[in-house]
Amino acid sequence: MLGIVVSHADAASMHIGEHLRSLRDWETSVDETRPDDEGGGTVYQIDSVELREFEALHLDIENVAAAFDDPDLLVFASKHAGETDELLTAHHTGNFGVAEHGGEDGQFARACPGAHKAVVSALQRHAPPDYEVGMECTHHGPTAVGVPSMFVEVGSAEPQWEDPDAAEAAARAILDLADEPADRPRENGTRRHLLGVGGGHYAPRFERVVRETDWAVGHIAANWSLDALAEWADSDEERDTVLDRAFRASAADYALMEGDRPDLTAAIESLGYRVVSETFVQEATGVNLGLVEALEDAIRPVDEGLRFGALAPGYDGEWTVLDLPKELISDVRGVDSEALRDTIERQSIAYATEQNGTVVTGPIVCPATTELEAVVDPLVEILKQRFDSVERNADELVARETAFDPDLARTADIPEGPKFGKLASGESVEIDGEEIDPERFQRERIRRYTL
């Protein structure tokens, strides 16, 4: 069940609450077991959604889930204050350092990465034309909620807090979360959740990940949050304890880091978590995490050049590694590197690359049922653009070409220079009154590739 918290101490929260109630036909009941200012009194319910109102400012309310009837997710309707003009935003709550605005020092509410991803998308769908949609780093309280939670906010000043279109957009986005799970599905013993580390308060890099990949982001420690942690923590051990809490409160085993922080990377890895790149996140999108792990073990890590082919998304069958001759891959790449990549990507689950993923080298991973010919034959067609003939004999490819032999030309005392170059490109030249035919200096070359 989705629980919605509306605070009487926040005008924007009340405004969003008004639109929440107007958008649906709610059933009302009276809860006499709690004071009216603590979520009792009139309770609004529809299907799997329950709305309650509280007198206190929501960032100061602790254990608010206890007021609701067994919620799975809580959303705080709220204002956003800042110098960001028209903005709809969503974020998780907690404190990496001293709790200056609710909650406890170095503590975090349980994040809801999956629902947060969904609400960012919903805010984008419903946003008025003049409003930006964004996400923020983790900040303020509460830190003890009882279930996964987040704030959904309208900002950034009084004109926006009173804007009915903005309040309605936030209300619609919140209602879209009915039956939305707090977390991404579990796979391979983990989830597609990231702890965000570094960057600015409004976290554009992590927002890009949320929008463009199938990963979700839990708590985010912005640069200022890391400074607050360093100032508050008395030791590396205390710092690591807070980081571990942030991972646990995000249900995350992975961190995505903004900037180069070797000491922090080492600390995170010592806790048993993995720091990944945005390349990893993009490449692993749509690919079963168990398959990602297996192929990284078998070939190489994504950050060292593993790339996933067109067959990878959703693939859960057996696979095999084809280790084609390096000379074959190199020669095909020399003929047409784009055609090589397109061919390998189309035929493969994964393949190895070098130079930051720009140069395909192999090996190649294909479904176990793949016939060798299915991979090799398209490469032969590319080779034919250079060679006069390419034939397959048993387990061998034989490529033949007739080409200019510079050593042969030198033995005939052809001087280096422009005329030498013309001969190399197949043009006749005149030397000492004699016309020299380039065919005199051509030889058949044979390339053999053992499959």
From Swiss-Prot:
Cofactor comment text:
Binds 2 Zn(2+) ions per subunit.
EC numbers for this chain: 3.1.1.96
Which reaction(s) does its UniProt entry say it catalyses?
a D-aminoacyl-tRNA + H2O = a tRNA + a D-alpha-amino acid + H(+); glycyl-tRNA(Ala) + H2O = tRNA(Ala) + glycine + H(+)
Supply the InterPro entries for this chain: Deacylase_DtdA_archaea, DtdA
GO MF terms here are: D-aminoacyl-tRNA deacylase activity; zinc ion binding
User: Keywords assigned by UniProt?
Assistant: Hydrolase, Metal-binding, Zinc
Major enzyme class? hydrolase
Q: Which Gene3D superfamilies match?
A: AF0625-like
**Region Disordered: start-end pairs:** 410-437
Cofactor list: Zn(2+)
Which GO biological process categories is it annotated with? D-amino acid catabolic process
What the entry lists under SUPFAM superfamilies is as follows: AF0625-like
Highest rank taxon of the organism: Archaea
Name any one Pfam family assigned in the record.
tRNA_deacylase
Q: Does the keyword Hydrolase apply?
A: yes
Q: Does the keyword Zinc apply?
A: yes
User: What HAMAP family does UniProt report for this protein, alphabetically?
Assistant: Deacylase_DtdA
Give the protein family.
Answer: Belongs to the DtdA deacylase family.
Please explain the role this protein plays, according to its UniProt record.
D-aminoacyl-tRNA deacylase with broad substrate specificity. By recycling D-aminoacyl-tRNA to D-amino acids and free tRNA molecules, this enzyme counteracts the toxicity associated with the formation of D-aminoacyl-tRNA entities in vivo.
Quaternary structure per UniProt? Monomer.
The name under which this protein is listed is D-aminoacyl-tRNA deacylase
Q: What is the lineage of its organism?
A: Archaea, Methanobacteriati, Methanobacteriota, Stenosarchaea group, Halobacteria
